[in-house]
From Swiss-Prot:
Cofactor (UniProt): [4Fe-4S] cluster
Name the record gives this protein: UPF0313 protein Tpet_0582
NCBIfam families: SAM_YgiQ
Every Radical SAM core domain range: 288-560
Organism: Thermotoga petrophila (strain ATCC BAA-488 / DSM 13995 / JCM 10881 / RKU-1)
Database matches in PANTHER family: UPF0313 PROTEIN YGIQ
Amino acid sequence: MFLPTTREEMKKLGWRELDVILVTGDAYVDHPSFGVALIGHYLVSHGFKVGIIAQPDWRTEKDITRLGRPRLFFGVTAGNVDSMVANYTASKKKRKTDDYTPGGSGGKRPDRATIVYTNLIKRFFPEVPVVLGGLEASLRRFAHYDWWSEKVRKSILIDSKVDLLVYGMGEKAVLEIAQILSRTGDIEKCKSVRGVVWWSSQKPEGGIELPSYDEISENPEKYAEALKLQTWYTDPYKNILIYQKQDTRYVVQNPPQLPLSQEELDRLYLLPFEREVHPFYAKMGRVKAIETVKFSITAVRGCFGSCSFCALTQHQTTHVSYRSKDSILEEVRILTKKKDFKGTITDVGGPTANLYGSSCSIRETKGQCQKFCLYPSVCKIVRPNHDEFISLLESIRKIPGVRNVFVSSGIRHDFVLAEKDPDVFIRELVKYTPGQLKLAPEHAHPKVLSLMRKPPVELFLEFKRRFETLAKKIGKRKYVIGYFIVGHPGEGWRENNYLRDFILKHLGYFPQQIQIFTPTPGTVSTAMYYSGLDPFTGEKVHVERSLKVRNKMKENVLFKKKGREKR
């Protein structure tokens, strides 16, 4: 079932008005990999009428008014990615293309889309509550360093002039907001909901106070301190309120929602998604973003890898939840009935596929302890369950109509190597790899890897050796390729040349999977970039801020110039 995007579609459903209208910076793709589709179907499954306005023209009222006034609220998201990341390259050049836009052309979503869409709504529907959500809002919920303007900005809640922001995976919080507004019509009563951020003119009682906006704007050390506190105390099982003074107001973060249970996840992903681009947008052109996920399966949520540069850990938390085998197999059966299904499940995973079935007795009862689960090595309390993941893949492959099952969404090779006999899993993984297994060592120099919270590169080489040896034994030509980041805090020319030499010596190919680090809001790495400090150790960190030098670092690793750079 597609959710309505026009009045005509509302009439076909017999709906005179909508309870909630969701506004997004992406094209409307009715697939569970797209947040608006998830939230929309979740609300509909609980009896609410929901419509979607995707990529509205922000220069006119034509799009934003086409569904009328919602009974309860507008929900606003920039889309699956931060709008500034969507619109600009790592060199701050305007992108000409956008995979989330029909036809692939850039310019269909504004910079700082959450703020722009909210202002548009307030212009034409000033009395209707607006609730922010999605990655852009979630990662900008407190004062944050904005690389594109090179300054610390206030919470997007303040900049948008709204009352409520949902952070993290928002199904439960959005449903509670809808239920409260339906009963009372009072947005103030929604400020008790877990997983929301709100503002107050009064200082909250209790909780953790972060350094203020003024403090972190003037003192980078305070910025690093604020990020550390936010990271440690944003945990559903610690149940702690966090707040930050911004001018005369306080931005208040309620404790996160508890992760969805397995039963809740199962029901969510089996809602009646069309798994297609909505016809209203499909007629405007191809939406490239659906092509890699259309026949994929989300099996896992959350990741306890805690990579410094990763926004997903900050957004989905370190708490891993996963779906039951029965639910996943039912979704596969649904996919096999699609007319354009050609027998291949392109991915079974999530942020990190092989965390499926894993557990930790401490995290599940007391919350994240003040240690990293996988850094500097895999914690002994964390329990992997690779057997269950392989059993799941085998069961999928036996379903009539399925010829291939692949794992494409990331494997933590250090987690595999922590097993007593890693080859048991690796041997099976070979069968579920489409020619090349993509891993993310990210760098080679020990200092940079330590700041990234990534394992030693020797573990990548060990996994690569085992994988390719086992593939060869069964007569398969399958290889491991690596993804790398340059320009991350801690990298200078010495570390960059170290990475170049590592690739030349150990990989034997010219890599194309090189990206320049982009300081996105809310991550540990961005705190390092702004402050020049490691938030968790207080140690000084070298930061390369020159765009010209960062581009040269990429060229150096891509072997576009002969010889090593000398600096």
